[in-house]
Amino acid sequence: MKSCSIILILSVLFLCGCSSYPVPPEMVAKYAENIVVDGIHNEKGWSETPEYQLTTARSRMKELHPDLREKYGRNPASPGTVRLLFDRQYLYVGAVLTDDDIISLGTRDQQVHCGEGDVFEIFLKPENANYYWELHITPAGYCAVIFYPSRGYHFLSKIVMPEVRPLKKIKYKSVISGTLNRSGDFDRLWSLEAAIPLDELAAKGIPFDSDHPWRILIGRYNYSCHQKICELSSFPQLNRFNFHAHEEYGTIRLVRAKSKIRP
């Protein structure tokens, strides 16, 4: 009987030790009013909501050539941060992205911008539904929105990039500190704000509120002539770089003004 107990304990420890997928963290969105979508983050609410650092995937140290691991395997060479706010109408996403070569070759909205230069991506998914949203925002000020009925529709041509943007009331603004599409100099950063309409999210069936859990992933493509690779980063940290890995998305926790944020 004692030996069986030991075997059971060892089996549990083995299974726990083999798991490479930790529980995704939550992202707190604090309630704030009078947010102006200008890409600057100068309202008080932005300084009062938690800041999250974009990271490389856990697998990068193994996947990269040894010559690249030290610079690109542990932390992004070009760091980025993201914060969340909300009010009665919108979920606000704000980001500050260090960037030594700001490039954005896309020429319109509703374009697959991750193949056209630097892009900031937002993925939103209800916990208890298959559908989800993908949003692209570029330093040049373009935006693309994709609605997926399911991850099983991911590569269907009519789903990949619809001509008409599904979120008609979305607001966004990018601000750059540097020069756009000029590779001969060194840029500093670009920042952005996006306001995602809650009623249009809810129109697909599930409200965006505290009674209905939603999940989120932030992704970034960073191209640079000064770096040796195109650098991808995200929050939460992914096991491997797959921005459609819903199981690794973080959970959103909406916090009213007087609520305390758990450390």
Which residues are covered by each model-predicted region?
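Structural preference for beta-rich elements and adjacent junctions enriched in aromatics
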Residues: 18-263
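Bacterial N-terminal signal peptides
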Residues: 7-16
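Positively charged n-region of N-terminal signal peptides that target proteins for export
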Residues: 1-5
